[in-house]
A protein has these predicted regions:
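Aromatic-anchored glycine-rich loop motif in surface-exposed flexible loops
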Residues: 1-54, 69-89
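An aromatic- and glycine-enriched ligand-binding surface/loop that stacks and positions planar moieties
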Residues: 36, 56, 62, 66-177
Length: 177
């Protein structure tokens, strides 16, 4: 997507100005090599603390890199390993801190009604982590808006909607090929 860039495989301890550009394919091949190593050596998702990538996240990214390298069978194999991982599953039941959430509603008549569904649970602040029961998430950002310093403490005053701020800006990307 971005064209040529250097591949640096050794730690740089002093200023360097003689970098050699690598092609996109060389970069993707290095990513593949690194991710194959990661799949082998990173912890299983159930043995990893929240917010840290596991071998499931490495497999997911590897499947995308293999698509870029036009190795579609390899991509299917890696994606299938993620899908069939016994620790992963699509959420089909309410979970987390808000599974029993009730809402009085705008026309409150004295009885609270259950509110939300599984999809709603997936994206609620402080509710989407594996520790909360979310087995669908491959890797997520850890933050807690109810904890002092646990969310956005920038100049905007601490309104942390991170899960709504990031996303693919596909309309602004240009393929160089």
């Amino acid at each position: 997507m971005w064209g040529k860039a250097p591949i640096v495989l050794e730690e740089t301890t002093s200023p360097q100005f003689n970098y050699q550009s690598a092609t996109q394919e060389e970069i993707y091949k290095q990513c593949k090599e690194d991710l194959l190593f990661a799949v082998q050596w990173m912890p299983e998702i159930d043995n990893q603390k929240g917010g840290r990538a596991s071998n499931v996240a490495a497999r997911h990214l590897l499947s995308e890199i293999l698509i870029c390298l036009k190795d579609y069978n390899g991509a299917v194999e890696q994606a299938t390993a993620v899908i069939n991982n016994p620790s992963m599953s699509l959420m089909t039941e309410r979970f987390g801190k808000l599974k029993d959430f009730t809402f009085e509603g705008y026309d409150y008549q004295g009885e609270k009604e259950p509110w939300g569904d599984v999809y709603w649970d997936l994206f609620r602040e402080n509710n989407f982590n594996r520790i909360d029961g979310n087995k669908e998430c491959i890797w997520n950002v850890q933050f807690d808006v109810e904890l002092q310093g646990g969310g956005n403490t920038g100049v905007s005053g601490g309104n942390f909607g991170l899960e709504r701020w990031f996303g693919a800006a596909w309309w602004s990307q240009k393929d160089l090929d």
